[in-house]
A protein has these predicted regions:
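Mid-to-C-terminal alpha-helical segments outside catalytic/metal-binding sites
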Residues: 1-10, 15-43, 210-212, 225-255
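Mobile, glycine- and charge-enriched loop segments
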Residues: 1-22, 62-84, 184-187
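A cross-domain feature marking catalytic cores of carbohydrate-active enzymes
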Residues: 8-10, 48, 83-87, 109-112, ...
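Divalent metal-dependent hydrolysis catalytic cores, especially in the metallo-beta-lactamase
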Residues: 9, 30-56, 79-84, 106-110
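Acidic-and-aromatic substrate-binding clefts and catalytic sites of carbohydrate-active enzymes
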Residues: 20-27, 52-62, 86-93, 116-122, ...
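Active-site gating/metal-coordination segments in enzymes
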Residues: 58-139
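Catalytic pocket-lining loop regions of alpha/beta-barrel enzymes
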Residues: 106, 120-214
């Protein structure tokens, strides 16, 4: 069965490899692709990040976005880039959306506000940025948890497909479920914390349906093989597993 990892932070350089432990410091783009394909993953998506402190202004984010495009050139059909925007830089973010749209890039994120010095999804600048994303029917993957209501953003931009990253603990899972029940344009990716809890995937499928759950790992922070086995280990019907591992991402990304 094909596996699409919706949530990876790819890299060519050490500064962009978000590994936790020094034993993984020698990984490069080739090693990254080998690890992922050995886990059964045939396609990845996501934004490039850096271990370095972010400099003031939008230039640092723009460089990460260009690195994502360079990785697409080297990785070919293996990788769908995601790109960064920032509500403190409305004009630059809108220009970046236009730039990426012209190149066929439809995925914003994963957006990681705590790394980039912002924490709002409801300000005027953010809404203006998302208005343009709505015009282009883009996808927006964002880091969770957040301690504010995402409802206004979701309601105001029905043409944007929002993807919340990380199921989280039991309380957070229930918050995801309630928000997803109110907003049909909200999906959840399985990366990061949460999937190791036995039964969480089956619970999500029961509550919101398999069609709105995307496989993701958060590699290289997390071990991709563990996530593949966590999905397979739920012993869900084959057609449900197929939707989660690849079908939903393929549909949303128009692969």
């Amino acid at each position: 069965m094909e596996i699409i990892d919706f949530h990876v932070h790819p890299f060519r350089r050490k500064e962009n490899c978000l590994n936790f432990y020094p034993e993984m410091d020698d990984l490069d783009a080739s090693g990254m692709q080998n690890q992922l394909t050995q886990a059964g993953i045939s396609h990845i998506c996501g934004s490039v990040l850096t271990k370095q402190p972010m400099e003031p202004g939008f230039d640092g984010l723009r460089r990460l976005n260009r690195e994502a495009l360079a990785l697409r050139e080297s990785l070919g059909d293996f990788y769908t880039p995601g790109f960064h925007i920032h509500p403190a830089f409305c004009r630059e973010s809108c220009e970046e959306i236009d730039f990426m749209h012209r190149r066929g890039i439809r995925l914003m994120g994963e957006l990681v506000p705590y790394m980039h010095g912002w924490g709002e999804f409801d300000g005027q600048s953010w809404m203006e940025i998302m208005d343009l994303a709505d015009d282009y029917s883009l996808l927006c993957c964002y880091h969770t948890p957040f301690a504010f209501d995402m409802g206004p953003m979701l309601s105001a931009h029905p043409n944007v497909t929002f993807v919340a990253a990380h199921p989280g603990d039991r309380e957070r899972v229930e918050e995801h479920i309630q928000l997803m029940k109110r907003h049909d344009n909200l999906y959840l990716d399985l990366s990061g914390t949460g999937l190791f809890r036995l039964g969480v995937l089956r619970h999500l499928v029961t509550q919101v349906g398999a069609e709105r759950i995307l496989f993701g790992t958060d590699y290289p922070i997390c071990n991709p093989r563990m996530y593949v086995q966590a999905v397979l280990g739920e012993n869900l019907p084959e057609e449900v597993t197929e939707k989660i591992l690849c079908g939903n991402s393929r549909r949303l990304l128009q692969l």
